Structure formats: C-alpha cells, structure tokens
C-alpha cells in the first residue's frame, strides 16, 4: 500500500531566505563560521563595541561608592560623553582652522571647553584637564 500523509502534517517546503536571516548575515547577531581553504571551520571574532562604560563606572564609584547604574543609565551616560566629545572636537577643529593651523593643540581644546561649557563648569573642566595633561607629561 502506498503511504498516505495525514492532512495535519506538512512536508518542509523550500523557502527563499529572508533578508537578514541566516548565519553571518548583516542582520544576524551571532557571527557565522568562516571557512579556510582546507575546509576547517574557524569562528570569526565579533567586532568589539567601544564604550566609555568602564570609565563612567570608575568615576561613579569614586563619587558614590555605594551606588550602581542600570544598563539604560549607562547607555545614556555613554551617549552624553560621546556628544560632549564630538562638540569639543568640532569646536577645537574650527578654532584651528580660524588660526590657520594644521594641528589641534591643548590650547584649542581648552578654548573649546571654555566656549561650550557654562561658567563654573568650564573652570572645573579646564583645571581637571590641565591636571591630567600635567600628570601625563610627568609620567613620560
């Protein structure tokens, strides 16, 4: 007797691959396996996501040792630091162009910080920056 399939069970059909589906695709989260010429499978290294997270955490522990931070809070702080960095870099670059120079120096960074940050905050930022540069130059 020929085997009959029950109407509830379906055989797998060939489907076209969906966009972003599968290993190693643009949308997949996990990296796929790369093949070498010999055929041995080798895992690809995942691209590292750069973040200021560890530095934000160190500063938090210096200021408030008993306080933690959520991943959402860390993400917001990371975005904030990136934003301030971009603003200072853009302003320092503009100042360098105005003065017809080709190198951004600590003087341009300091002036950019003074222009971007208000009053007392700018003074504290400049003093901390000067302290950090002095510490770096003496350690070299």
UniProtKB/Swiss-Prot annotation:
Identify the residue span(s) of motif SPKK motif 3: 16-19
Q: Where is this motif: SPKK motif 1?
A: 6-9
Q: Where is this cross-link: Glycyl lysine isopeptide (Lys-Gly) (interchain with G-Cter in ubiquitin)?
A: 135
PTM statement from Swiss-Prot or TrEMBL: Monoubiquitination of Lys-135 gives a specific tag for epigenetic transcriptional activation and is also prerequisite for histone H3 'Lys-4' and 'Lys-79' methylation.
Instruction: Enumerate the subcellular locations listed in this protein's record, separating them with semicolons.
Output: Nucleus; Chromosome
Q: Where is this motif: SPKK motif 2?
A: 11-14
Q: Give any Gene Ontology cellular component.
A: nucleosome
InterPro entries xrefs = Histone-fold, Histone_H2A/H2B/H3, Histone_H2B, HISTONE_H2B_site
The domain of life for this entry's organism is: Eukaryota
SUPFAM superfamilies per UniProt: Histone-fold
Q: What is the stated purpose of this protein? A: Core component of nucleosome. Nucleosomes wrap and compact DNA into chromatin, limiting DNA accessibility to the cellular machineries which require DNA as a template. Histones thereby play a central role in transcription regulation, DNA repair, DNA replication and chromosomal stability. DNA accessibility is regulated via a complex set of post-translational modifications of histones, also called histone code, and nucleosome remodeling.
Q: Which family does it belong to?
A: Belongs to the histone H2B family.
* Protein name (database record): Histone H2B.1, sperm
